[in-house]
């Protein structure tokens, strides 16, 4: 029930963000602050030495600030808002594709960092991302090209790397979730780990 309630709440927030940019300011503020606190908590539990902990926290703070700032600035333009929306769909598709294909086909593990990740899941992630991005881009532009496949592959691979990175940190910190901010889902970073890297890499590519 908690997971369903959280999903509905996030859907409502997404719709508000699309229609009203004012809502985006508050969402990004909460997202930034909570994500930073979750990251710092992870680093603290891993018990790096003070220098590495400081560098890690500073780097992530700068990264989050740039991510949220650019996200907000681009959202002021309808064309970029559509692009961001499509990229977010791609990141979500990557996550869902990995989960579904991994559950159905199972097979060899992808890495020790995250035992639940399989090669089948990684391939499924790319396949579903290609399908979803192709449909979304065709819907908005009535046009398709091979570039869509390239963008989809970059999106999926980037999301999977982001996911694995935070899985590595959680494994080192010996925790299941980065937090409990989202009931039934864990912390914000548990839901947006892939998006943080996926959207950033895509925007650089575009």
Residue ranges and their predicted role:
Residues 40, 162-177:
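Transmembrane alpha-helical segments of integral membrane proteins
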Residues 172-194:
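Interfacial loop-to-transmembrane junctions
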């Amino acid at each position: 029930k908690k997971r369903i309630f959280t999903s509905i709440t996030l859907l409502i927030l997404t719709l508000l963000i699309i229609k009203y940019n004012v809502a985006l300011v508050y969402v990004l503020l909460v997202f930034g602050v909570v994500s930073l606190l979750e990251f710092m908590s992870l680093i603290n539990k891993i018990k790096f030495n003070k220098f590495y902990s400081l560098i890690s926290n500073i780097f992530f703070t700068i990264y989050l600030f740039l991510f949220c700032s650019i996200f907000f600035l681009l959202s002021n333009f309808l064309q970029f808002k559509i692009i961001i929306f499509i990229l977010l769909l791609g990141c979500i598709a990557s996550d869902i594709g990995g989960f579904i294909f991994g559950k159905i086909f199972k097979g060899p593990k992808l890495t020790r960092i995250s035992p639940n990740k399989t090669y089948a899941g990684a391939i499924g992630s790319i396949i579903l991302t290609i399908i979803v991005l192709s449909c979304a881009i065709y819907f908005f532009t009535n046009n398709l090209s091979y570039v869509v496949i390239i963008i989809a592959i970059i999106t999926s691979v980037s999301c999977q790397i982001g996911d694995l990175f935070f899985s590595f940190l959680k494994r080192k910190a010996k925790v299941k979730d980065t937090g409990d901010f989202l009931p039934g889902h864990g912390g914000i970073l548990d839901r947006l780990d892939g998006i943080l890297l996926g959207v950033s890499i895509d925007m650089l590519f575009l």
